[in-house]
UniProtKB/Swiss-Prot annotation:
Protein name as catalogued: Peptide chain release factor 2
Keyword entries, A-Z: Cytoplasm, Methylation, Protein biosynthesis
Family: Belongs to the prokaryotic/mitochondrial release factor family.
Organism: Yersinia pseudotuberculosis serotype O:1b (strain IP 31758)
Post-translational modification remark: Methylated by PrmC. Methylation increases the termination efficiency of RF2.
Length: 365
């Protein structure tokens, strides 16, 4: 006798996921549009306008990929349910194993479509920068910023991404006032883009001799690395460039030469800084590259009203734009947008973020 309940549960899970995608991808509208495009492409005079015909061909290919895959999934799930019934009625192990093999194929197809849905943005495949900024709260908030840095570095390592710390500004007693990390690898921005927002920590502070509960905030801001050939006009007169001595980990040159560079774009108040090289010139080039990326993201967010508007004033880190709450006393971390939560707080702080990230991506945030 076979264990059929796990197989039935898996069929139901795949059916539910397919239904979610069907709605999110607006299957009915796409199928209708595909019929219209096919009808246009069948017209004998369609190639009188080659550019129009090519655009229609490209649109058809995109629509077919979605419509055909969902059709195959729905038909496949119906077939596999029938196959399972046959296997049980005939007590046929070979047919039962065939059912499981077919489910694997369907799961793979569905996973590819879910992946496509999650990473459909123009820059999702790009490397990215992650800016971390401690909020008000002094040493406790600065320690929280350093905990977040460690968490994201661990997560990136577990995903096979390379990381490069571009800038670190040490806290007054412990932790960090700010840090910028470059995360290098395919789909780095796609994976991390929904992590932009305020992260709230509640714990008994190790810096409070009375062991009282403290609430601290730190912000994360993720933006893609843009291609050098992207045309972003930057007027040199709009820039304030400061040089200073590097602080934090960085080798023997730290605090000996003014190699660190901070660039402020005065019209937008966007700031970038770099201190990870001995050469002031190289640090300036990197800071300019970050500025270009930030300005590009700023312009994109201005054009797209459905995206979260870039906050010019990073000092306003508080309750308003929270995305996740880390309550360590109660062993509870909860994403305030998706409702996903876990009690394994240490695993999350050690970089186990996938359940939160995947939920936010699947929700289309």
């Amino acid at each position: 006798m076979f264990e059929i309940n796990p197989v039935k549960n898996r069929i139901q899970d795949l059916s539910d996921r397919t239904a979610v995608l069907r709605g999110y991808l607006d299957y009915d509208a796409k199928k209708e549009r595909l019929e219209e495009v096919n009808a246009e492409l069948e017209q004998p005079d369609v190639w009188n306008e080659p550019e129009r015909a090519q655009a229609l061909g490209k649109e058809r290919s995109t629509l077919e990929e979605i419509v055909t895959t969902i059709d195959q999934l729905e038909q496949g799930l119906e077939d596999v349910s029938g196959l399972l019934e046959l296997a049980v009625e005939a007590d046929d192990e070979e047919t039962f194993n065939e059912t499981i093999a077919e489910l694997e194929v369907l799961d793979g197809k569905l996973g590819q479509l879910e992946f496509r849905r999650m990473f459909s943005g123009e820059y999702d495949r790009a490397n990215c920068y992650l800016d971390l900024q401690a909020g008000s709260g002094g040493t406790e908030a600065q320690d929280w910023a350093s905990m977040l840095l460690r968490m994201y570095l661990r997560w990136a390592e577990s995903r096979g991404f390379k990381t490069e710390i571009i800038e670190e500004s040490d806290g007054d007693v412990a932790g960090l006032k700010s840090a910028t990390v470059k995360i290098i690898g395919e789909y780095a921005f796609g994976w991390l883009r929904t992590e932009t927002g305020v992260h709230r920590l509640v714990r008994k502070s190790p810096f409070d001799s009375g062991g009282r509960r403290h609430t601290s905030f730190s912000s994360a801001f993720v933006y893609p690395e843009v291609d050098d050939d992207i045309d972003i006009e930057i007027n040199p007169a709009d820039l304030r460039i400061d040089v200073y001595r590097a602080s934090g980990a960085g080798g023997q040159h730290v605090n000996k030469t003014e190699s660190a560079v901070r660039i402020t774009h005065i019209p937008t108040n966007i700031v970038t800084q770099c201190q990870n090289d001995r050469s002031q010139h190289k640090n300036k080039d990197q800071a300019m590259k970050q500025l270009k990326a930030k300005l590009y993201e700023f312009e994109m967010q201005k054009k797209n009203a459905d995206k979260q508007v870039l906050e010019d004033n990073k000092s306003d880190i508080g309750w308003g734009s929270q995305i996740r709450s880390y309550v360590l006393d109660d062993s509870r971390i909860k994403d305030l947008r998706t409702g996903v939560e876990t009690r394994n707080t240490q695993a999350v702080l050690d970089g186990d973020l996938d359940k939160f990230i995947e939920a936010s991506l699947k929700a289309g945030l």
